[in-house]
Structures are given as structure tokens and as C-alpha cells.
Amino acid sequence: MKTEVAKIENVKRDWYLVDAQEMVLGRLASQIANILRGKNKAIYTPSVDTGDFVIVVNAEKIALTGRKLADKSYYSHSGFPGGLKEISAGKLLEKKPEELIKRAVKGMLPKNKLSRHMLKKLKIYAGSSHPHDAQQPKVLAL
């Protein structure tokens, strides 16, 4: 008997709802990355995107341990000389809390073409409401 390889047309995708309130960023991001990859499914295949959709609410209430709010920095570059931008995790949490979770999850996904497709299945909202009620997401307690 041969091992069955997952095909993209046979993958059934579920929607999960995660409440990020008072959850630690790194622990939450690693569990979300596993769901986006599909590692929680029996049909997981590394070369096929078998993951599910994840909706994260209350991103503004996420917790960081230690002094990471002040000490952890995120960098971006415009491509021009002297165009290096730096922002601390605390300021990023105030301005764009969705970006903080997105960057953490992106760093835990594989660095290949599939990671862009996996990241598109992640929906993050700062508040407690989301527009995905029609998909009937299952509440996931992490």
C-alpha cells in the first residue's frame, strides 16, 4: 500500500477563531503557524498547502514577556541610502497590532513560495469583531 500524497483539490479547509487576549506572542504565533501549514491534519504534505484559515481577534491585547516591549526592535529598509527604519515592539503594538502578530507568524513559516499562500489565510483584527461570520469559524482554545 502506497502512502497517499495530498492534492490541492482534495484539501478541505476549516476556519478557526483565536482570541489573542492576554496570550504570549511567540507561543501563539507558533501554534497559528502550525495550523496555517496544516501540520495538525493527517494528510499533511510539506509540498502542498494543506492548512486552514485562522482569524485572530483582540490583537491589541497580546502579551509580550520580559522587557520585549521596549527592547525588541523591528527593521525595514526603503532601498535608498540611509533608509533603515527601526520601530520597537511597544510602538508597533500601539500603531499596528496586526503587524506584530503577522511578523511573528511569518518568521515561523517556511521560507519558500508556499509561505505567501499560507500567510494569506491569516486574518488579524485589532478589536473583538471580524467580518467572517459567514464562514462559521470554530473557536480554538490555545
Swiss-Prot record:
Taxonomic source organism: Pelobacter propionicus (strain DSM 2379 / NBRC 103807 / OttBd1)
Domain of life: Bacteria
Subunit-structure text: Part of the 50S ribosomal subunit.
Protein name (database record): Large ribosomal subunit protein uL13
Gene: rplM
Function of the molecule: This protein is one of the early assembly proteins of the 50S ribosomal subunit, although it is not seen to bind rRNA by itself. It is important during the early stages of 50S assembly.
Lineage, broadest ranks: Bacteria, Pseudomonadati, Thermodesulfobacteriota, Desulfuromonadia, Desulfuromonadales
Gene3D superfamilies named among the record's database cross-references: Ribosomal protein L13
Homology family: Belongs to the universal ribosomal protein uL13 family.
Molecular function GO labels: mRNA binding; structural constituent of ribosome
Keywords for the protein's UniProt record, in alphabetical order: Ribonucleoprotein, Ribosomal protein
